[in-house]
Amino acid sequence: MGWLFGAPRLVEEKDALKGGPHPVLPNPQPHAVLGTLRGQPGTETIYIGIGCYWGAEKLFWETPGVVYTSVGFAGGITPNPTYRETCTGRTNHTEIVEVVYDPTQVTFDELVVKAMEAHDPTQGYRQGNDTGTQYRSAIYTAGPNAEQQAQRAREIVEHYAPKLAAAGLGRITTEILPLASTPAGEYYMAEDEHQQYLHKNPLGYCPHHSTGVACGIPEA
């Protein structure tokens, strides 16, 4: 475990779990709330980590312009990780919401701002009482504009940093990269029982760790 004997930390590749040869969810079902499928034409995708993915996914499936969401893992080493494997801290993945959106209805900037305002991006390897590298803050971009979008996300985060500092909060630790530049280079969907979890389990665990500090969208 990456934090068994001290503070959470990422593990070296030689110590990471080996994972599996096949996806844990090879045939995703239609979205339980939106009724949609992955891979819709005319859409774009952003991968967002803001702590426990159950509540985070609900936040985004309720966002106008978002046409599909799923939960899974990215940013780490282990291929095709299970939820239990990721919870050991030995995959280096973080919990992620895949957000597929119609860019004519909601913008990339708006989704980044929503993500930043919905959690505390200064907490490092935790969110509230949820501790571990799998809860770290992250934004991963994808598609032909991934590099430009990653740079734009950094600009938004840099715009937010002094506002958080003025509120007495620390340095932003959000990891921002094109998904293809992460160690595994992929997003791995979690098991079906985790998809749209709070729709299936309305009384399920749903922490919110917003700082209450507005971010806003800086000029491009």
UniProtKB/Swiss-Prot annotation:
Record Pfam families: PMSR
MF terms (GO), sorted A to Z: L-methionine-(S)-S-oxide reductase activity; peptide-methionine (S)-S-oxide reductase activity
EC number: 1.8.4.11
UniProt GO BP: cellular response to oxidative stress; protein modification process
Active site: C52
Cellular-component GO terms for this entry: cytoplasm
Function: Has an important function as a repair enzyme for proteins that have been inactivated by oxidation. Catalyzes the reversible oxidation-reduction of methionine sulfoxide in proteins to methionine.
Entry-linked HAMAP family: MsrA (MF_01401)
Family that this chain belongs to: Belongs to the MsrA Met sulfoxide reductase family.
The name this protein goes by in its record: Peptide methionine sulfoxide reductase MsrA
Provenance organism: Corynebacterium diphtheriae (strain ATCC 700971 / NCTC 13129 / Biotype gravis)
Highest classification ranks of the organism: Bacteria, Bacillati, Actinomycetota, Actinomycetes, Mycobacteriales
